[in-house]
């Protein structure tokens, strides 16, 4: 499978990892020791919500976000596959529910 560079912008700094196209970005982050928020791991809540600021993801497996939210850049990292090099701001659940 292809791999992409995924950059996570977290409250404690920025980290770039390599994520295969068939791996959820949350799983890839955890494999490198990056501690990101999550709860259900099934795309059915907003605990892992982030914002895509560059690039693109496929999150068809998720159910919590609506079309408008996804078009605005919201992403559930637990069900997001990278489809290009992508930058994601993490720890955004409070902004999403605002």
Swiss-Prot record:
**2Fe-2S ferredoxin-type domain mapped to chain residues:** 4-94
Q: Which domain of life is it from?
A: Eukaryota
From the Swiss-Prot or TrEMBL record, state where the protein is found. Plastid, Chloroplast
Give the matching Pfam families.
Answer: Fer2
Claim: Iron is one of the keywords in the record: yes
Q: Which GO terms describe its biological process?
A: electron transport chain
Record's keyword annotation contains Magnesium: no
Q: Per the record, GO CC terms?
A: chloroplast stroma
In which broad location class does this protein mainly occur, judging by the first location in its UniProt entry? Answer: plastid
Residues reported in the UniProt entry to bind [2Fe-2S] cluster:
40, 45, 48, 78
- SUPFAM superfamilies for this protein: 2Fe-2S ferredoxin-like (SSF54292)
The family database entries (InterPro entries) matched by this protein are listed as: 2Fe-2S_ferredoxin-like_sf, 2Fe-2S_ferredoxin-type, 2Fe2S_fd_BS, Beta-grasp_dom_sf, Fd_pln
Gene Ontology terms for molecular function: 2 iron, 2 sulfur cluster binding; electron transfer activity; metal ion binding
Please provide the record's keywords in A-Z order.
2Fe-2S, Chloroplast, Electron transport, Iron, Iron-sulfur, Metal-binding, Plastid, Transport
Report the cofactor remark.
Binds 1 [2Fe-2S] cluster.
PANTHER family, A to Z: FERREDOXIN, FERREDOXIN-2, CHLOROPLASTIC
Family assignment from sequence similarity: Belongs to the 2Fe2S plant-type ferredoxin family.
The entry's function note states: Ferredoxins are iron-sulfur proteins that transfer electrons in a wide variety of metabolic reactions.
Q: What is this protein called?
A: Ferredoxin-2
């Amino acid at each position: 499978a292809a791999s992409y560079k995924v950059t996570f912008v977290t409250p404690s700094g920025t980290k770039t990892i390599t994520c295969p196209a068939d791996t959820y970005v949350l799983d890839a982050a955890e494999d490198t020791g990056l501690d990101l928020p999550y709860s259900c791991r099934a795309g059915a809540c907003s605990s892992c919500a982030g914002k895509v600021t560059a690039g693109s993801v496929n999150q068809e497996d998720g159910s919590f976000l609506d079309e408008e939210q996804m078009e605005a850049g919201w992403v559930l990292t637990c069900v997001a596959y990278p489809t290009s090099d992508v930058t994601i701001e993490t720890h955004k659940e409070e902004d999403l529910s605002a």
